Structures are given as C-alpha cells and as structure tokens.
UniProtKB/Swiss-Prot annotation:
Enzyme class: hydrolase
Keyword Zinc in record: no
Record PANTHER family: UREASE
Pathway(s) where this gene product acts: Nitrogen metabolism; urea degradation; CO(2) and NH(3) from urea (urease route): step 1/1
Record protein name field: Urease subunit beta
Gene name per UniProt: ureB
Family (UniProt): Belongs to the urease beta subunit family.
CDD domains membership: Urease_beta
Subunit structure: Heterotrimer of UreA (gamma), UreB (beta) and UreC (alpha) subunits. Three heterotrimers associate to form the active enzyme.
Any one of the GO CC terms: urease complex
InterPro entries referenced in this protein's UniProt entry, alphabetically: Urease_beta-like, Urease_betasu_sf, Urease_subunit
Catalytic activity: urea + 2 H2O + H(+) = hydrogencarbonate + 2 NH4(+)
C-alpha cells in the first residue's frame, strides 16, 4: 500500500444507507450567505434560516463528509437531511441540545 492510497471496491457507494431521511424547504431570511457543513446538527443552524426545526432535530445534511451547502440571502432551497447515528448525543454547536436527542 502506498501512503494516501485508496483501495475501494467496484460499483456504487451509497451514502447513509438505511437511515431515516426528511426533505425540508429552507429559506435564508438574512442579509448574508450562510454555509452549513455536512455534519452540523441542522436543528441548531443559524436562526436566519427558516424551516421546520422540529423535523430537523437529530438530523444533518445528507451529503458527503467534508462538503457543505450554501444558502444565499433570500434564497429558498430544498435539502435532504439524514438522522445522526451513533449514540445520538449532541454537544456544542449553538448549545440548544447539550445531551441526548
């Protein structure tokens, strides 16, 4: 193996297979762009983003790790969210949860 080399199987790789998902319409009501990373607890995003926060609790963007979605001022877009995995304990972010989901 060469350092940094990736060995992957042939075929398609399905991200987040078998996890619960939800699609939400999200509007940036602010005057500045807002970018949300792949593993940010979507429930705790910038308050200028308007969407059904209750449906976003325990969810993150259903996108590849290390990527992000940008919301321009006045823009509304649909995003798919996926359930957080693991112990489903959330600390940090905006401090809205600080414990079990």
């Amino acid at each position: 193996m060469i350092p940094g080399e990736l060995l992957i199987e042939d075929g398609e790789i399905e991200l987040n297979a078998g996890r619960a998902t939800v699609t939400l319409s999200v509007a940036n009501t602010g005057d500045r762009p807002i970018q949300v990373g792949s593993h940010y607890h979507f429930f705790e995003t910038n308050p200028a983003l308007r969407f059904d926060r209750d449906k976003a609790r325990g969810m993150r963007l259903d996108i590849a790790a290390g990527t992000a979605v940008r919301f321009e001022p006045g823009q509304t877009r649909d995003v798919q969210l996926v359930a957080l995995a693991g112990k489903r304990v959330v600390y940090g972010f905006r401090g809205d949860v600080m414990g079990k989901l």
